[in-house]
Amino acid sequence: MGLYLNPNADAFMQNRNKKIYVDKSQIIYELNDLIDSDDNFVCLSRPRRFGKSMAGNMISAYYSKGCDTREVFSLMKLGQEPCFDKYLNKFNVIKLDLNGWYQRAIQRNRKDLLLTDIHETLVDEFKVAFPALSFCSGETLDQCILKVYSETGEKFVIIIDEYDVLIRE
């Protein structure tokens, strides 16, 4: 379990434990229908302050192998669905908040290294998560993902929050 590869459910649990929380877990029911389909690339775009980050945290907590969230989701609306646990904690998840990465790059006055920093961090997490496989810093992220998939058959869910920060800023 890493910070970005197979993250835990802490961010989602913080959202879930807020005084005001709206259960939007049924979106996962809809997403589950898209897994292994031609429509498996999804973009959740809504106005600001609409809960996209919370949805990303929830989606990560549901799919990530880095946590066990059966008890949490069984008590939510999704838990009422017959196959709510079909994909529960079954995928390698990469979850990135590009705004956080961007802000750190700005603080260091190194926007030019933003993608390099993300890449190096993820390759380091791949090395820890999959010690039986060898990864080198020259490999691209897609090469790392394909290596894991070809060697283990394990699939990935990739969640990118604040994906528009590079265009917006």
Question: What are these model-predicted stretches?
Answer:
Residues 1-169:
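Phosphate-binding site recognition
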